[in-house]
From Swiss-Prot:
Binds 1 Mn(2+) ion per subunit. Coiled coil: none annotated. Mn(2+) binds at K192, H211, D249. Its cofactor is Mn(2+). The gene is pckA. Belongs to the phosphoenolpyruvate carboxykinase (ATP) family. GO terms for biological process: gluconeogenesis. This is Phosphoenolpyruvate carboxykinase (ATP). Its EC number is 4.1.1.49. Keywords: ATP-binding, Cytoplasm, Decarboxylase, Gluconeogenesis, Lyase, Manganese, Metal-binding, Nucleotide-binding. The keyword Ion transport does not apply. NCBIfam families: pckA, PRK09344.1-2, PRK09344.1-3. Pathway: Carbohydrate biosynthesis; gluconeogenesis.
Amino acid sequence: MYGLEKLGINNVTAAHYNLSPAQLVEKALANNEGILSDTGAFVISTGKYTGRAPDDKFFVDTPEVHKYIDWSRNQPIEKEKFDAIFGKLVAYLQNREIFIFDGRAGANPEYTRRFRVINELASQNLFIHQLLIRTDEEYNENNDIDFTIISAPNFHCVPEIDGVNSEAAIIINFEKKIAIICATKYSGEIKKSVFSIMNYIMPHENILPMHCSANMDPVTHETAIFFGLSGTGKTTLSADPNRKLIGDDEHGWCDKGIFNFEGGCYAKCINLKEESEPEIYRAIKFGSLVENVVVDPITRKIQYEDASITPNTRVGYPIDYIPNAELSGVGGIPKVVIFLTADSFGVLPPISRLSQEAAMYHFVTGFTAKLAGTELGVKEPVPTFSTCFGEPFMPMDPSVYAEMLGERLKKHNTKVYLINTGWSGGAYGTGKRINLKYTRAMVTAVLNGYFDNAEYKHDDIFNLDIPQSCPGVPSEIMNPIDTWQDRDKYIIAAKKLANLFYNNFKEKYPNMPENITNAGPKYND
């Protein structure tokens, strides 16, 4: 039944296949998995795990994949250990109700992959139903499934026996084309497992997988992509009422253009307001899954400003909940690439122009601050360097992805900008987060070509070119030193961050070509 016997899953009490969102909400309510908000969205608590658990993620080390995976950044697990855990997981699923969703990753039909996701929770099946690309196909046992993911939040590993680090484990086995997710209800683990799998598969077909959002001009069809780690603004900035949204997080870049890996969005909703983010706010309705928000027990209104459970409150919804979405999920060659960073030091400019060499430097550097709640244990912003703006999800050597991006930027003469959505006027705790209104104005100016002929000032500490004006943005915030009350303290903080850049690059990329190395900050005494 639904290929379960091939996996060794037998004697389930019920197997529900490709239920509709309404059916899944009914099941989840009946199973006490969550509640409905006043807008009809389904609200759940994910318990202990309110963010990803990167220390609990593993790849099965087999001869077939060993040479392709960068083991300096990814944890291996023995095939025998995986088999033992999988055997116990399969036994655990006996006499349980399970939910199955068949969908696709990759909107370009030439490169699409079929995924089967098996859940013990109806709410998690609702999430992945809304996040992957949905098909109208009925079940056909002859349809090949490219990868199967099994998520069982109530199944716990035993670290001492299973060779993992905690009761939770996210294990991807490329040889068997199976991934398992144990002991965590955080739905993002399913989504990011799909992404990690695609990030391994796609480069073998000369497709650059990217941790980015993308949108498109509805008239010219020119596309822009926004790279960035969690919380830097990918989803927010790509949801632009004047442009068509292609996708908010995961894309591939092939010879003909870009394509979304997904069929939905997964947005942060802490401090969400309709005035500043209307598209996301209005997407929180029936069929959406909301995680870890506080809900008024009487009115059932979501208290978006309340971070008492976690700052990493999230909502998953299908992309057609965004009114101006490009439902094909496909766009042309990007005209503009924007790197988003959330600088908690408060010293990077709000926007700077990058040469192709500087673009390569900042792509492999991937600087940002991990924002509170996005990973287990992160309570306040932590400066981090995440290769390709997505190191936790990139199984292969970073040079693979960097070279592919470099080739494409050069071939298409794509313009690249670095935008800081983090702090201004001081570091985290003293400065303020850059106003979203100003960041949107800068993005609009980039897309309109305003900065092509703007006046620039070179920043010697960070080796960046800073435009001196932008429509809709106060000129005094363009140069970060002007936003600090104490300029000497700014210089000390800026040099500290520049040295972090320098030391990170020197340690990670000693063999990088000199022209790329020289495009970054120099060491400051």
